[in-house]
UniProtKB/Swiss-Prot annotation:
Residues 95-147, 191-202, 252-726, 776-778, 850-860, 925-927 are cytoplasmic. The gene is SLC8A3. Ca(2+) 4 binds at residues 445, 471, 475, 478. Belongs to the Ca(2+):cation antiporter (CaCA) (TC 2.A.19) family. SLC8 subfamily. The chain crosses the membrane at residues 74-94, 148-168, 170-190, 203-223, 231-251, 727-747, 755-775, 779-799, 829-849, 861-881, 904-924. Pfam families: Calx-beta, Na_Ca_ex, Na_Ca_ex_C. This is Sodium/calcium exchanger 3. The cytoplasmic Calx-beta domains bind the regulatory Ca(2+). The first Calx-beta domain can bind up to four Ca(2+) ions. The second domain can bind another two Ca(2+) ions that are essential for calcium-regulated ion exchange.
Amino acid sequence: MAWLRLQPLTSAFLHFGLVTFVLFLNGLRAEAGGSGDVPSTGQNNESCSGSSDCKEGVILPIWYPENPSLGDKIARVIVYFVALIYMFLGVSIIADRFMASIEVITSQEREVTIKKPNGETSTTTIRVWNETVSNLTLMALGSSAPEILLSLIEVCGHGFIAGDLGPSTIVGSAAFNMFIIIGICVYVIPDGETRKIKHLRVFFITAAWSIFAYIWLYMILAVFSPGVVQVWEGLLTLFFFPVCVLLAWVADKRLLFYKYMHKKYRTDKHRGIIIETEGDHPKGIEMDGKMMNSHFLDGNLVPLEGKEVDESRREMIRILKDLKQKHPEKDLDQLVEMANYYALSHQQKSRAFYRIQATRMMTGAGNILKKHAAEQAKKASSMSEVHTDEPEDFISKVFFDPCSYQCLENCGAVLLTVVRKGGDMSKTMYVDYKTEDGSANAGADYEFTEGTVVLKPGETQKEFSVGIIDDDIFEEDEHFFVRLSNVRIEEEQPEEGMPPAIFNSLPLPRAVLASPCVATVTILDDDHAGIFTFECDTIHVSESIGVMEVKVLRTSGARGTVIVPFRTVEGTAKGGGEDFEDTYGELEFKNDETVKTIRVKIVDEEEYERQENFFIALGEPKWMERGISALLLSPDVTDRKLTMEEEEAKRIAEMGKPVLGEHPKLEVIIEESYEFKTTVDKLIKKTNLALVVGTHSWRDQFMEAITVSAAGDEDEDESGEERLPSCFDYVMHFLTVFWKVLFACVPPTEYCHGWACFAVSILIIGMLTAIIGDLASHFGCTIGLKDSVTAVVFVAFGTSVPDTFASKAAALQDVYADASIGNVTGSNAVNVFLGIGLAWSVAAIYWALQGQEFHVSAGTLAFSVTLFTIFAFVCISVLLYRRRPHLGGELGGPRGCKLATTWLFVSLWLLYILFATLEAYCYIKGF
């Protein structure tokens, strides 16, 4: 019973080897002339036993002599078999380039304007290609290109005569995908974990079409016109492909009847199979991974693309917050790199990415994500080590620092500072200055001043003063200007003995005026207690500011001590530490003090988009003057009659008392952090997988082709550090280095947005597929296997191995099962509609133009199609049954259920291979 403990994949390979061995012995027996005890089924011996007479291939000729000895035959079988494996490796590697071009093509983005429920609009970028459409067209073509092209090349290369290799490969590949790949995906999920299909509507559509595709094949072969494919049958088969894509897109976008059906699908509760629910639904139930009615907010339609963009931003913000908590010692750049690798590793990936990853890890090209992370780290470290040594600047810059000055009217004089920066500090420099009137007038408010500032060798700054005139007249704040001009350097004389030519060749030191070369001086009146105000009525602050500082200005006077109360007032932003800390208190302005600062703590919520407001309000200022002015302004004085002198004094006191100015209330608008928003946007752009799998130049491709890298898993660590290559990596690299270097000549994916790489790659895949078809046919005829059996067993297996590893990786790494098994059904349907539909349409049209019919043998293919359709019904039914609550999803679940499902699917595949082989050799009767 020890064999029961073998893993399903190992068991599948074991059975595969046994079947191959039996078929090989059968071929040798047939070649040796043994008649055997083959039951009579009404078919001739050649049809039942297969033929050892090899035919000319599309590219490869026949290997002569045609009837070799047993030893030579075994040698030829080994050569053909090894050549097949090597060609399969080559196809996998060029398919890697092909899928990279598809990833780049489907990652193209365009700008859209999204209208929010509140009427605001925002511009963002979304992908041009719909995910469902790309999966059923380019992605399916990329993963199934060898099968599709083999069918087309076989028909066209053999004079438009139907062959068994192409169609049987498509059906055999569909069986391998449906049973073996899904079985492996079910098993590899850790015990107790599950994976569900997210886009269930799309899965229903593609599953239905995949079943219909093979039913349709049977109807063409055995019902409508047995043994003949007419033109309308071929064209209609091909036409089903865009119809399938269109219906899947309608289901994904919820168009037509989906738009009016706020439903989910559900079978009877008593049967327990909860697929989706219909009718009324509780709040928060998901359909296809999206909230029900989530696209209707306040009666307005919000595009689903906008919601997906917002979801991406929220996920990126969550990653940044988590990493910041785990690694508080890291700076922002380090956190960005870590978040980039984490997001790339954990985001939902396309089928193309998993196919590329599987091929590269299998051929010693390494883990794409780890290589990308290592390259980014090296690039960052090299950038930090670059020090640009700028040549010495011979130009000296002269300017005011600072450029704005304030002084009280009674200060006497104001000092201004001139600064020299750069150039030759050993020279003496001169710069002229002159005052200019603004609202303040020379002679009345300040003293007109002009002169020259001398900066001696080694001096970097110099001060000069301008006199301020004081008066007892109450007036507004006034200002004037001071302008620099005519900067020059003292002329230098040549040293004794220095030739004039050498002296004249030396660079002359230069000096220029730099901004700011004009200073503004504001004179504050000191004959008034002051007008208290904010600088403006609205201020925008970033949520990451921490503690914001707001200035309260005292203008039009600064006499006496004044207390100004203040407090924060809630708006849409809430206090109490939710959005900001409640702040209140009093500002005490001393005599001649003109500026005070209010500090308010802002809570950083790290939101991508934020706009909330609160207010800071100033109360009535209180004059702390204890003279006659304060006495006359007190409420007690109003009870008695004032004398003429007191009335005049009170009028003057009223004019000079402190009051609130133009902006007594400040609105503070809290916005998202620009740096944080930019970081999130940058991360979203950097986490585009097209940047990881794509190439930018031929140099990059050749360097990658000759480099050995470690294959490791993404789950090993979060740092993204590369490991050293293993022995297996080196072996696979040297086995495939010829293909890698050859296919490095394919145009990089950056050219023509990936289309150049797409076109060249598909041409190369077609050439290699033609060779594979010839090798497979010659391999089969050498050992006496029929083309239909060779296709179902060998060719289908060889073309599906990369997809197997890709689906396994997708099942383990993705949250949902769409990338691992959701694309299997769609790919199977596309194989029939494109692979068989295109080939048969071309052949049917060709023979129709010749006035003849296109004949296709219905027997073996019709039997295989019928058998696969029955088994596919069983497989899909089991997958839907696994959505019961106690199992939870198509993949994973309890260990016993996993094993049972996997064994069932593997057994279905083995039965399919067995029955198809027995029917081909007439051991059982087909159609």
